[in-house]
A protein has these predicted regions:
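Small/polar-rich, solvent-exposed N-terminal microdomains that initiate assembly or binding
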Residues: 1-44, 62-73, 78-84
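Short, charged interaction patches at domain edges and termini
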Residues: 1-9, 24-25, 37-49, 85-115
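Residue-level detector of short, conserved catalytic/binding motifs and their immediate flanks
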Residues: 52
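Short hydrophobic/aromatic beta-strand micro-patches
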Residues: 55-57, 112
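Short coil/turn segments at secondary-structure boundaries
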Residues: 59-62, 97
């Protein structure tokens, strides 16, 4: 299972959730992006240190901001059998409005992942 799939499984309560590509509709949605990470240690450990980004788009500022907080509470500090620790690296970043006047945010995370 990939890191993005593992993260997706933690966000089952989030509607309109996409992985790798945020479609132009619906207006209110969330997308998980794989953003690379850090090289595996040469010490022989099996742990990887991938990074990922969550982007949120919403037509309502207050609703979207609340969703960002909900997602961050679901992820930050969370541990599973494969994701040994998820850490928010950026807080909640306000990206402004897109060309259709929908508000956007991003949150960047780092984790330790065991295959």
């Amino acid at each position: 299972m990939s890191v993005t799939s593992e993260v997706e499984s933690l966000l089952t309560t989030v509607s309109s959730l996409y992985v790798g590509n945020m479609p132009s509709t619906p207006d209110n949605c969330v997308c998980i992006y794989n953003t690379g990470g850090y090289p595996r240690s040469l010490s022989g450990t099996e742990l990887e240190e991938p990074t990922f980004q969550i982007r949120v788009r919403n037509s309502s500022y207050s609703t979207g901001e609340a969703l960002c907080n909900t997602i961050n509470n679901l992820l930050h500090g969370h541990t599973t059998t494969k994701l040994l620790m998820i850490e928010n690296q950026s807080g909640i970043l306000d990206l402004g409005r897109d060309e259709l006047n929908r508000q956007e945010w991003s949150m960047n995370y780092r984790c330790y992942f065991r295959q």
